[in-house]
Amino acid sequence: IETFKAANHLKIDLQKLYDVAKLGSGNSGALNRIADKAIAGNYKGYVFSVNNVLKDLTYINELLKDLPHAEKLSSLTKSFYKEAVDKGKGDLLMSELIKDH
C-alpha cells in the first residue's frame, strides 16, 4: 500500500509499477486484489480497515520486541498506518490509502 500510495503521489504509472511488482512477488494474490482494482480507479480492493492493520501491527511489534532489527522494520510500517489513523482515516480500507485523501 505504501509503495502504491507513494507512486500515485509521484504520478508514477501504477500499471508499470504493478507489472514490475508482479515479477518479484510470485504473482501475489494480495497484490493482484489491490493493484488491479486500484489501477481501474476502485480503491476498495483489499477489504481490511486501517484500524485493523494498525491493531495487527501493534501485536506484531509486541512479538518482535526481542528482535530489534525486525521490530524496527515493523515499527516503520506501523507508523504509516498510525499516521493514517491519527488523521481520521482508520475506517478506510487499507487499499483506499493508495488514493490521496
Residue map of PLM features:
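Helical "substrate-binding/catalytic lid" subdomain
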Residues: 1-101
